[in-house]
Structures are given as structure tokens and as C-alpha cells.
Amino acid sequence: MTLDLTPDELLSTTRAVRKRLDLDRPVPRRLIEECIDLATQAPTGRNRQRWHFIVVTEPRLRRKVGDIFLRALAAAEGQPLNEHDIRRMNHAPRSTQGVFDGLRHLTDNIHRVPAFVIPAIEGRTDHASAAVQSGTWGSILPATWSFMLAARARGLGTTWTTAQGPLERELAATLGVPYDEVMLAAFIPLAYTIGTDFKPAPRIPRDQVLHWERW
């Protein structure tokens, strides 16, 4: 069963869900597979389809992966933000605080999340040119966002994290992923949501981000 959402409603209400995850309700395998089927309809560079999705639901493995998530977050904590991030944070301090509050709730309950989805792509971008990086990331990010949209349509919540970054090699080894050949693109907690009444989020006004013809 899917929610009765128009395309515009789906696009404007697929939120990063950290607090409103139903941690006691398992996610059926068939629903995850439906979302993956839709994800792989996304565009991919030269139709090479180098994407992969690792889904973790087994309790002991989830605990191991959750531990890596927490240690990776701790490793990233305290790293300096660039000036662009700082400027945007100052633009909406209340929203930023909400993100931190949600992240705290997620980390406190990470071992209770019923499923993790780790999108991956064949080929690494370490020390690659901007053009190579653009082509590689452009072949996994659209599919991952399509997965998240499909999940929302089925009453599931997701949040995009890159917590795997500092400990990507360890996470890859834990999941049997050949690190030298495959890059882990994100770390996505997945669960049913508590309620489905998500709303569009406050955003920077269009006239501050839209540029016609030139910057």
C-alpha cells in the first residue's frame, strides 16, 4: 500500500526522519525490494548501472554496524566547518538546532533501527578529478534519492547520513564489500514512520538561490 500523495507532495514532504522512526515495527523485505526496484530506474552515467545496495536487518550485524556508525560520528565530531556551512547555519539557527536534536535521538536509538541501507557504487573517487567525481556520484545519488522517495510513499522514513566516511574501510570489511573496488556512498537508517503527516520544510527563499543566465 502506498500513501495518497501527489508528485509535488511526495517531493516536498520526504523529510530526513530521525525522531519519528517506529523502532518497534519490522520493515518487510518486499517493501525494501520494491524501493530498490524503483531506485534502479534512476539515471546513471552511460547506463553503466554500477550501483549496489547493502541492506542490513540481521540483529547481530545491525548492532555491529550501529557501533561503527557511532564511532564514525565520534571520529568526525569536532572537525572544523567551512565558511559556507557556517554562514548557512547562522541563517537558520533554529533549524540547525533541530537537526542536532534529531541526530542525538537517532544516535541514542541507533541499535533499535530495524534496517540500514548502504548504497554503494563500483569504482572509487579517491584523488580523482572533479569530472570523474561528478560522474561517479551522479550515478549513485539520484538512485539513492529515488529509494528515499519510494520509501516515503510506502510510509517509511529515511535520513541521509554520511557517517560511514571516517570508518568506511571498517564498515566495508564488516559487510564483505571490496573496499578497493567499491565505494560506500551513504548510510541510511530505515523504519516505518510514526504518523505520515510530514510537511514542507522552511527553506532559503528562491530569489537567494535561483540565478537566471549567470551568477
Descriptions of predicted regions:
Residues 55-138:
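Glycine/small-residue-rich phosphate/adenosyl-binding loop
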